[in-house]
Amino acid sequence: MAISKLIPTLVLFVLFSFDVSVAHPGLGFGWGSNSPIGGSFYSNLYPQFYQFSCPQADEIVMTVLEKAIAKEPRMAASLLRLHFHDCFVQGCDASILLDDSATIRSEKNAGPNKNSVRGFQVIDEIKAKLEQACPQTVSCADILALAARGSTILSGGPSWELPLGRRDSRTASLNGANTNIPAPNSTIQNLLTMFQRKGLNEEDLVSLSGGHTIGVARCTTFKQRLYNQNGNNQPDETLERSYYYGLRSICPPTGGDNNISPLDLASPARFDNTYFKLLLWGKGLLTSDEVLLTGNVGKTGALVKAYAEDERLFFQQFAKSMVNMGNIQPLTGFNGEIRKSCHVIN
């Protein structure tokens, strides 16, 4: 009798004990439904995460990006940078998108981000369209990763197979944003240390710095190089002379801190390897660019020369390094949430 009573219970247990990776993507879980064989969605990101739960996700992202970048080519670099600044602070969790609230001190107000990071309205537009198509399925963290890849492609750069499945944080770290994002005047050792803390190596540092092949920087980030690089009221002697005088016309000794200069003066809206060629010619804009060549630590200088000579090599490593960066401490499984709106927690 006891056994016969137990049988229905066992049947129900078997019927409902299926792999949660095929669960419905709604209810804020954002689950995909095509987990790799032998893998687990708790610990792994994988490119097919939205194959069944939101197959049109990338198409939606690219449609918004095409319009935004056509309207303002600089936006591509802004979105690439937004992903970088997110991942270096408590992982790739979209914490950078959160606004101030009763419980959140926004990373947007940190020194490296304030009046600097941008592209939030593009992310919001992508999120709104994804919410219409696939409610509470695609995370803001994944939107940042998809937007970074799409921006690179639309600027003429490489594509890569992008692991997905990140979830969104319920917290932000203002202090982390102030201490974990490399400064534009960083030494080569500072850069290497900060990247190593995130599990990234020299190849990652140099290739990801190559993202500066697009975009601009404000005068305040490079003024020191022009007027007082070593505390002696003298310019950085590594600057090529004509480039130096051109920068002085953009960035006077006093005022003009928000004036901008392209990071790659030759092809500022095209993703190519010209950035590395310019470094060899003394035309890198930021100290953190120039020290990749002149820092005399490890093999960064050799990598600069290699990427300057071989654009394909740079593209291949950049793609690998973007995946590496995108894998920094993602929230997966039941950690975090899928935000309905990227700038507030649910």
UniProtKB/Swiss-Prot annotation:
It catalyses: 2 a phenolic donor + H2O2 = 2 a phenolic radical donor + 2 H2O. CDD domains: secretory_peroxidase. It is found in: Secreted. Keywords: Calcium, Disulfide bond, Glycoprotein, Heme, Hydrogen peroxide, Iron, Metal-binding, Oxidoreductase, Peroxidase, Secreted, Signal. Its main location: secreted. Disulfide bonds join C54-C134, C87-C92, C140-C342, C219-C251. InterPro entries: Haem_peroxidase, Haem_peroxidase_sf, Peroxidase_pln, Peroxidases_AS, Peroxidases_heam-ligand_BS, Secretory_peroxidase. Belongs to the peroxidase family. Classical plant (class III) peroxidase subfamily. There are 73 peroxidase genes in A.thaliana. This is Peroxidase 9. The lineage of its organism: Eukaryota, Viridiplantae, Streptophyta, Embryophyta, Tracheophyta.
